[in-house]
Swiss-Prot record:
One of its GO terms (biological process) is mRNA processing. One of its GO terms (molecular function) is RNA binding. Keywords: Acetylation, Apoptosis, mRNA processing, mRNA splicing, Nucleus, Phosphoprotein, Spliceosome. Its main location: nucleus. It comes from Rattus norvegicus (Rat). GO terms for cellular component: Cajal body; cytoplasm; nuclear speck; nucleus; spliceosomal complex. It is found in: Nucleus speckle; Nucleus, Cajal body. Associates with spliceosomes. Associates with U4/U5/U6 tri-snRNP and with U2 snRNP. Involved in spliceosome assembly. This is Survival of motor neuron-related-splicing factor 30. A motif (Nuclear localization signal) lies at residues 142-160. Belongs to the SMN family. Residues 72-132 form the Tudor domain.
Length: 238
């Protein structure tokens, strides 16, 4: 999705440059000014949507960030870790440690979900619980946690769908406006001319389909002329 959004953003920017170039010669054109404003808005919307594409687990783990691990962990230890689905801290157990990459495979006690998380993000159980109490979070039952997760996922999905819908609508609106702009530009530059296919039906019974370019449409075909006098034999010496 990020790649598609990046392509769309490049397209919007290219369109904006062309509109700005057109405005340099007609700075008071209301249609062009409105188109410029709309393009600027959709560019900002696309940038905003692109900024949400990277993993959101980075922001959720900010409260656990540090430069070096403050605890020596081993397999089987209990810890407090951030669940990537909602950014909340839960009790978990360390299943495996990768010292080379500084990560640990953990299993959350409440849901049984397994994740791989940086060792820097892990906290001792007591320290993690105290941090939650200090922040005003009261312990919840398993049922309450499940209900909270469902509500969070629902809101997140709705918000994402709405953002995508708004962006797609902006794209369609810009497509129509851009086509209208191009059509008006053609009409102004080609005033009095009619865009016709060379294969269009002739306007008279003597016209020929496919014959009519260069201003000779609907005229009778050129009559055949005898060119035998120019035969190469007449040029040979007698």
């Amino acid at each position: 999705m990020s790649e598609d959004l990046a392509k769309q953003l490049a397209s919007y920017k290219a369109q904006l440059q062309q509109v700005e170039a057109a405005l340099s010669g007609n700075g008071e054109n209301e249609d062009l000014l409105k188109l410029k404003k709309d393009l600027q808005e959709v560019i900002e919307l696309t940038k905003d949507l692109l900024s949400t594409q990277p993993s959101e687990t980075l922001t959720s783990s900010d409260s656990f960030a540090s430069t070096q691990p403050t605890h020596s962990w081993k397999v089987g230890d209990k810890c407090m870790a951030v669940w990537s689905e909602d950014g909340q801290c839960y009790e978990a157990e360390i299943e495996e440690i990768d010292e080379e990459n500084g990560t640990a495979a953990i299993t959350f006690a409440v849901y049984g979900n397994a994740e791989v998380t940086p060792l820097l993000n892990l906290k001792p159980v007591e320290e993690g619980r105290k941090a939650k109490e200090d922040s005003g979070n009261k312990p919840m039952s398993k049922k309450e946690m499940i209900a909270q997760q469902r509500e969070y996922k629902k809101k997140k999905a709705l918000k994402k769908a709405q953002r995508i819908k708004e962006l797609e609508q902006e794209r369609e609106d810009q497509k129509v406006k851009w086509q209208q702009f191009n059509n008006r530009a053609y009409s102004k530059n080609k005033k009095g001319q009619v865009k016709r296919s060379i294969f269009a039906s002739p306007e008279s019974v003597t016209g020929k389909v496919g014959v009519g370019t260069c201003g000779i449409a609907d005229k009778p075909m050129t009559q055949y002329q005898d060119t035998s006098k120019y035969n190469v034999r007449h040029l040979m010496p007698q």
